[in-house]
Amino acid sequence: METKYLNKLEFDKVLNILSNFATTYIGKELALNLIPSNDKEMVKQLQNETSEAYSLIYRNGNLPIDAIPNILPHLKMLDSNCILSIKYLLDIANILKISREFQEYFSSSMQITENKSSILYKYFSKIYSNYNIENQIFSAILDENALNDNASTSLASIRRNIRKTEQQIRDKLNSYLSSKYLQERLVTIKNNRFVVPVKSEYRSEIKGFIHGTSSTGSTLFIEPMNVFELNNSLAVLHIEEEREIERILQRLSNLLYDITENLKININMIGKLDLIFAKAKYAISIDATEPIINSEKYVNLIKVRHPLISSDTVVPIDINIGKTFQVLLITGSNTGGKTVTLKTFGLICAMAMCGLYIPAKEGSSVYVFDNIFADIGDEQSILASLSTFSSHMVNIIEILNSVTSNSLVLLDEIGSGTDPIEGANLGISILNYLYNNKVLVLSTTHYPELKNYALVTDGYENASSEFDIENLRPTYKLLIGIPGQS
């Protein structure tokens, strides 16, 4: 199904709203790239998935999910037997945690006997969890930059010795803090060595090693001789600490080498479930219902609402096609909402074919088309110095060359932009071609010749956007069987 036609209906805006209901970067990406399926059984499956997610939300609350990191680069490193950083290990532990919580959510939502009959079981059942590995990583890590002291007994011992040695150094250096030789009464660190700030004129008064000067040269940072050995001991302890951290990171990475494929599957399943539950949350937000998917090539929408118009202002309409007529001609004033009706119809069909619930009353039914074609509004080709009429004709010719008997065609102001008589005759010819090829067509027009043609031709029906004569304003209601006044 070609996205250029869907974009004319503003389907991309629907997907953008849907993506906001997804939580993970994968779910959002899947939502933004959603394309209607033209496989009836697949559409039914997608609708069933949305229905089960809808029920699970009402039964057990929302899926326990937060934004997740992209761990695919981490897994690639593991496949090369690399040692992961603290942050990367923490990222993977978070994925394992979310995976476990997904399983717990599903298990608590379903009776044991229901699990395997669940539509979503095939996704949840593929998710791998390992609390032992998850717990080992979380227990070892303090935050994304540091390990806990208890990550190993050796690390705990080394860090105790570090703190002890640092305190010994500070105790010795504190004796200098009351000295007139210091620029400031503080102990600081230069080149990983504890030093004191000495006034440059007293450099000979404190024996030790100079590790730097202030920008003005008035201060020298001196490591006194009486802490030299302690600073050396501290440096050795820090080297031992780094080596022990490396050993711990290696040990934790070793836990993950054999489960990289499981984690890749987890990411995939988390993204798919995030999308499915996003569909359900979107349905709840717009008070949508599950459409009936029929095989008889008709569409019957009851009190349907445009999904991009606020529910406070949108006027629900009833619209059907395919049972008693194949071509529906919509007429009425330019401000009466004819184009909105076209877009509503196309959007609803596209949404249903993506597994989305539709903003319509229960009992509304949709056919799974092999393609949805639309000629609505002006195209970029107009900017390439084609007239409005020529632009529409280029689009329509492409549509006529591509349609099948299972296609839906939406035409806005067919035949407009040229001589009215020629435009009306051209419109009739195009509609007859589509009718003879058994295509379902919705078209708007302001030509009376087309309205009259629909009145006397089998398979055609008129409809109009109602206009309030007394108040001189459109009501936006659709009246099928009644031609309108343009």
Language model segments and positions:
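Non-transmembrane, heptad-repeat alpha-helical coiled-coil rod segments
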Residues: 238-272
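Extended, charged coiled-coil "arm/hinge" scaffolds of SMC/Rad50-like chromosome-maintenance ATPases
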Residues: 128-146, 229-250
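Extended, Lys/Arg-enriched charged tracts that mediate electrostatic binding to polyanionic substrates
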Residues: 155-202
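Long, charged, glycine-rich C-terminal linkers/tails
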Residues: 176-191, 280-303
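Conserved amphipathic alpha-helical "coupling/scaffold" segments
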Residues: 1-144, 150, 154, 158, ...
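ATPase nucleotide-binding head domains, primarily ABC-like/P-loop NTPase cores
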Residues: 286-289, 294-486
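Amphipathic alpha-helical transducer elements in NTP-driven molecular machines
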Residues: 12, 44-47, 65-68, 96, ...
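SMC-family hinge/dimerization module
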Residues: 190-221, 231, 294-316
